[in-house]
Amino acid sequence: MQNWETTATTNYEQHNAWYNSMFAANIKQEPGHHLDGNSVASSPRQSPIPSTNHLEQFLKQQQQQLQQQPMDTLCAMTPSPSQNDQNSLQHYDANLQQQLLQQQQYQQHFQAAQQQHHHHHHLMGGFNPLTPPGLPNPMQHFYGGNLRPSPQPTPTSASTIAPVAVATGSSEKLQALTPPMDVTPPKSPAKSSQSNIEPEKEHDQMSNSSEDMKYMAESEDDDTNIRMPIYNSHGKMKNYKCKTCGVVAITKVDFWAHTRTHMKPDKILQCPKCPFVTEFKHHLEYHIRKHKNQKPFQCDKCSYTCVNKSMLNSHRKSHSSVYQYRCADCDYATKYCHSFKLHLRKYGHKPGMVLDEDGTPNPSLVIDVYGTRRGPKSKNGGPIASGGSGSGSRKSNVAAVAPQQQQSQPAQPVATSQLSAALQGFPLVQGNSAPPAASPVLPLPASPAKSVASVEQTPSLPSPANLLPPLASLLQQNRNMAFFPYWNLNLQMLAAQQQAAVLAQLSPRMREQLQQQNQQQSDNEEEEQDDEYERKSVDSAMDLSQGTPVKEDEQQQQPQQPLAMNLKVEEEATPLMSSSNASRRKGRVLKLDTLLQLRSEAMTSPEQLKVPSTPMPTASSPIAGRKPMPEEHCSGTSSADESMETAHVPQANTSASSTASSSGNSSNASSNSNGNSSSNSSSNGTTSAVAAPPSGTPAAAGAIYECKYCDIFFKDAVLYTIHMGYHSCDDVFKCNMCGEKCDGPVGLFVHMARNAHS
């Protein structure tokens, strides 16, 4: 009968010997680690087991666990072992105890790793399945070495300390070999990254080429910033250009050494801590603040601080959405004047209207493109700057006169828009809304050179003439300006454009009301002037040797025009027109106050005497305040009357075209001064086809000139002539200046207001 106990023991020993021989041939052995002698002596028939390390023991235990289940089944099928086989049972007990101890150790390592990750709420270095549990995080040296594993329970046996030490040593070797899975490592170590952050910020600050960023903060004790070239974040090297000679340096030390050569020795101010030199005390003060890291200027909208006010102003623009500087020739817009000047110099463009910080247009600011001054220039009635050419500069020059008389101006109910915004600051030319008898005689200037600051102005209802700025004041403030070559005029052209723009925006109803109001005023004044004329003709002293009496109000109102003529008060009673009829009445108007006023006006402006003044060739201007005389009255004029008439007709003509003669139309004067007296007298008694003044219009209302194409009335011959000059001969709505064809009168007005013609 077969012995089942002997057969089972023999099979187990053979399998164990084969398993050990396999590991002995394939796994490298480590000397010094032997099994316990008791376990070896307890199995005399067992083959000698080679010493293994910690990893080999772990593999053995796993293999033995797999074999444990079939062995248990086999033992259940066989009878219980006899007394002779107690040694083999002790061998099984030793292996099971060793497996339990190793499992407890791995469970402790795994629990410690879980507690560490749970304490930081995230896997700092990412979870790597290739790393055994319990090993340190391979990325923890990037986040600091202060992390320590939680305390672990001390193993009970001394045999478990060696595996833990072996695992710790192997983890240090695996830190550099195990790559992270979910976290991207930094580009450089912590120390090098911190040292590179500060120079990068300084490079970005110094890369700004603006003058306002001249004194940027830098390290006080770091000489590399001033002795080495500086590169910005884009890799571009910072250059320092000399404003005097144009030499370009790449380091601050070289630039300061070169700048010293352009300074006077007695004006050099040098920094005590570095080679910085300057001629200005405030520059040295800002530089010393930089060394001391003092930044007294702070932004009220953020935490930005700086060493001077200029840098703070530049920084505040970063919080604003207003681009103050815009190019007139392209879509370029910027917040910084220095960049705007560079654009204008590079492309040869012209500047547009400068905006204030709140976004409102400011025509009084001019961009000096080639000047060294920072920011725009403010004009106070002076000549136009060299860089301020264009329509924007002319508007700003006209607007410079406005602040002198803004306080005395009443509010006018005139429709405003962008086209008429430039007229809001102008004082209005006043028209007499009351009859001449009720209106006092004002000491008005007799020439454009006379200052208009002393003229008292009374509020009146709006009229087309009230929409114009005072041309006499503008001419007096800007006598040295360049003239327009076409009409030999300067600001009259701009005034006509502005008037056309404003009148074009008035509604037809308002325009009709203004015309009816002016017509009613002129009719009332005409009736009163006729009654006064008849009364004075009867009551005044008669002298048959003199000509027709001159109206009193005519002499009172003629000086109200900005005249530049030769006033001869000795011949104030000489008639303007004479006739040979026996029934004519000749008398002298005995108004001493008016004569004294005329004499004083003539004495105050002697430089304007003897200026040739003739009517404009486009439209013959009528004598203000006179009825046209019949032609038969002029047929038999005596030679004496002809001589007196020739001497005084230019004076009457000046009342309607005085501004034209004062603005320099000498060519027209020379061409018309050779005419005889009969032609002058006939031209004074008639009007052209376009001029339609009412019959007997008094001097208070003045002559009215009408453009039949645009249905606009003018009270000044120069403005009327300028306006008619824009109408072309072949097409009345085609601009005669530039040839652009416009769509009706409104289109022509808008074209004149928006485009500069020179």
Curated annotation (Swiss-Prot):
Biased composition, class Polar residues, residue ranges: 39-51
Segments of this protein annotated with the region Disordered: 30-51, 172-214, 365-416, 513-536, 603-695
InterPro entries, alphabetized: Znf_C2H2_sf, Znf_C2H2_type
Tissue-specific expression: In embryo, expression of maternal transcript is highest in anterior region. Zygotic transcript is expressed in anterior region until the beginning of gastrulation and in posterior region until early gastrulation. After this, it is expressed in developing nervous system.
Molecular function GO labels: DNA-binding transcription factor activity; DNA-binding transcription factor activity, RNA polymerase II-specific; RNA polymerase II cis-regulatory region sequence-specific DNA binding; RNA polymerase II transcription regulatory region sequence-specific DNA binding; sequence-specific DNA binding; zinc ion binding
Ranges annotated as biased composition (Low complexity): 398-415, 513-522, 652-695
Compositionally biased tracts (Acidic residues): 523-532
GO cellular component labels: nucleus
Residues with PTM Phosphoserine: 188, 207, 209-210, 537, 540
SUPFAM superfamilies with a match to the protein in the record: beta-beta-alpha zinc fingers (SSF57667)
Subcellular location: Nucleus
Zinc finger C2H2-type: from-to: 240-262, 269-291, 297-319, 325-349, 705-727, 733-757
UniProt entry keywords in alphabetical sequence: Developmental protein, DNA-binding, Gap protein, Metal-binding, Nucleus, Phosphoprotein, Repeat, Zinc, Zinc-finger
Modified residues annotated as Phosphothreonine in this record: 178
Ranges of biased composition (kind: Basic and acidic residues): 198-214
PROSITE patterns referenced in this protein's UniProt entry, alphabetically: ZINC_FINGER_C2H2_1, ZINC_FINGER_C2H2_2
One annotated GO biological process: positive regulation of transcription by RNA polymerase II
Function text: Gap class segmentation protein that controls development of head structures.
Family the UniProt entry places it in: Belongs to the hunchback C2H2-type zinc-finger protein family.
Name of the molecule in the record: Protein hunchback
Organism: Drosophila melanogaster (Fruit fly)
